[in-house]
A protein has these predicted regions:
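Amphipathic, heptad-repeat alpha-helical segments
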Residues: 36-69
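Alpha-helical solenoid repeats of the armadillo/HEAT superfamily
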Residues: 9-26, 40, 44-52, 78-81, ...
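HEAT/armadillo-like alpha-solenoid scaffolds in large eukaryotic assembly and transport factors
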Residues: 42, 68-75, 97, 101-105, ...
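Leucine-rich repeat
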Residues: 186-187, 229, 270-271, 311-312, ...
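N-terminal segments that cap or nucleate solenoid repeat domains
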Residues: 147-191, 197-200, 204
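Alpha-helical bundle protein-protein interaction modules that mediate dimerization/oligomerization
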Residues: 68-148
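Buried hydrophobic core positions in alpha-solenoid tandem helical repeats
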Residues: 155-160, 200-203, 243-246, 282-286, ...
Length: 571
């Protein structure tokens, strides 16, 4: 039998009368619980609870502002109702002539005992919060901008006390205040995580019978998860990921968006990412990317990107159909979703043959090639190129698709000329590794000057080597060799890089380029290098036993000797 809820008192004097009635009933129960004749074991447990209640009531009476707290206006009437019900039950258990049903009496006793336990918990929570020692606690007033940490801490404790003890309206108002606090003060999230009961807040995510409370709680948990490392850690450690994934799976559109934000934030910590699989969240995230709103898709694919580096989850992504969903987001998602999807595809493409094959089977390579032409975001382009590079090395078939696409090769050449350093390096790496046709090499010959400039840059690591390999590949075409030596600035840069005193570049790189220029035997190419002063530097590098220098200097010197002998013969 459920205890009835008494009408809240309307004045302090009425509340005092109510407290007196509670004390009177409690005193009676403390004695009668020791003299009952039936269910003695249950009454012994109840006696212990009643003793604790007596202590709590005494503490409330000693609190200077207890009558001002609105929670007591509901708690005390409910408590009196429970005690009065227990008094009636104790009379029945004491009466030797009681002829009622034992099972019914036992059930009523257990229900009243459970109600008393809940009310004890609420009173204990209220006392521990310290709010009964503060004045004007009837109105939950937001601390002002100049409030100190102590005032803010009290506000948060009071807020969570109302949230845990109060009814639905108390909960809604407390959550509304919490959301205002988190929105108005970014730094408050850490204090909320420290002073508030985040575990209870997470419990409200499964508050299905009160959608309004559940929605507000989801917004609050999402804000905490996204605020900073400290509050995010508390949300995860208090078990927030599981309920958030359930909301992402079956909540309303608005709730799914908030849940996706939180899941992305939580999984940003590599130490948390593994748990997605434990909660069965891979399939949930994939479905959110497939059918969610644009906002949900953006954050869900961000979460997938976060977990894609976890070895066990990579295979799960393939098995749950993530690849076609990610490839679709590459062409249909907003800019942020595109960037995250491209990043994830790049990770998967570098993760083994199984995932690379899935990407190729879904025509992922063609979509990536198309994106190189259409996307202006440098970050997204970087991920796309990394994915392309991984796929290009997976099979001869994919390499042929790339090298035979004139449009793609021309776009790569444009990135070498106009992209940032990372894009230039990745593009140069592709040019140097693909078996590009002579026609396509001629089509991008104009990027050779940019490649020479890149050879001078010591950072990022590997840039000089990539630029050199791309140049050597392009210089297998005669017209490109002639075009490069006609570029006086590029020739002078090469000669300066050959100088042993120049330590900004490893000498093998410019030597490889010079060797590629003179390999065709063109007199004009050699003459321009000689006129620019390449020979003495090469000679010195040969003496230093730099790889390739001896052969390169022989080619230059051989041509020079032929010229001398020709002049002597004519004379």
């Amino acid at each position: 039998m459920q205890p009835t809820t008494a009408k809240p008192p309307t004045s302090t004097s009425a509340l005092q009368i109510l407290l007196n009635l509670i004390n009177e009933t409690l005193s009676h129960l403390l004695l009668s619980s020791l003299t009952v004749r039936s269910f003695i074991g249950r009454w012994q447990v109840l006696h212990s609870k009643l003793t604790s209640l007596s202590s709590s009531i005494s503490s409330i009476s000693d609190s200077p502002h207890w009558a001002e707290n609105p929670l007591l206006h509901t708690l005390l009437p409910n408590l009196l109702s429970t005690l009065q019900r227990l008094k009636a039950l104790s009379d029945q258990c004491t009466d030797a002539t009681y002829a009622g049903g034992k099972l019914h009496l036992q059930s009523d006793l257990d229900m009243a005992s459970a109600a008393l336990s809940n009310q004890l918990h609420d009173l204990d929570l209220l006392l521990r919060s310290g709010v009964l020692h503060q004045s004007n606690a009837i109105v939950l007033s937001h601390p002002g901008p100049g409030s100190g940490k102590d005032d803010l801490g009290f506000f948060i404790r009071d807020l969570f006390t109302r949230l845990q003890i109060g009814g639905v309206e108390f909960k809604k108002k407390a959550l509304e205040s919490l959301l205002h606090l988190l929105e108005d003060d970014e730094k408050s999230a850490s204090l909320v995580a420290k002073e508030g009961n985040v575990a209870y807040l997470i419990h409200l995510l499964d508050f299905h019978n009160q959608p309004g409370v559940r929605e507000q709680a989801t917004c609050a948990v999402s804000a905490l998860a996204a605020a900073n490392d400290e509050s995010r850690k508390v949300v995860f450690e208090e078990g927030g990921l599981g309920p958030l994934l359930r909301i992402l799976e079956s909540g309303s559109t608005a709730l799914k968006e908030k849940a996706a934000i939180a899941v992305e934030a939580i999984t940003a910590d590599p130490e948390n990412a593994w748990a997605v699989s434990a909660y069965g969240g891979v399939a949930v995230l994939v479905e959110a990317c497939r059918s969610g709103s644009p906002a949900t898709q953006t954050h869900a694919v961000g979460a997938i990107r976060n977990v894609a580096n976890v070895e066990d989850i990579k295979m799960g992504l393939g098995e749950e159909g993530a690849v076609p969903v990610l490839l679709q987001l590459l062409v249909s998602g907003n800019g942020v979703a595109q960037e995250k999807a491209a990043s994830t595809v790049a990770v998967l493409a570098s993760s083994g043959e199984y995932l690379r094959d899935l990407i190729v089977q879904e025509r992922g390579l063609q979509r990536l090639m198309h994106l190189v032409q259409d996307i202006s975001s440098s970050d997204t382009l970087e991920h796309v190129l990394r994915a392309v590079i991984s796929l290009s090395s997976s099979s001869d078939h994919t390499a042929r698709i790339l090298s035979s696409s004139t449009i793609f090769i021309i776009q790569i050449g444009e990135l070498i000329k106009r992209g940032n350093l990372v894009l230039q390096q990745l593009s140069a790496l592709l040019v140097g590794s693909l078996a590009i046709s002579d026609g396509n090499k001629r089509a991008i010959g104009s990027c050779m000057g940019s490649l020479v400039k890149l050879m001078e840059s010591p950072k990022p690591v590997g840039l000089q080597e990539s630029a050199t390999q791309a140049l050597v590949s392009l210089l297998t075409v005669r017209s490109n060799r002639k075009e490069l030596v006609r570029d006086e600035k590029s020739v002078m840069r090469l000669v300066l890089m050959l100088d042993p005193k120049n330590e900004t570049v490893a000498k093998t790189f410019p030597v490889m380029v010079v060797a590629a220029i003179v390999a065709g035997g063109s007199h004009s190419c050699r003459k321009r290098l000689l006129d620019a002063g390449a020979h003495p530097h090469l000679q010195r590098l040969s003496e230093m036993e730099v790889a390739g220098a001896k052969r390169a200097v022989q080619r230059l010197a051989g041509n020079r000797l032929k010229t001398i002998f020709s002049r002597t013969w004519r004379e």
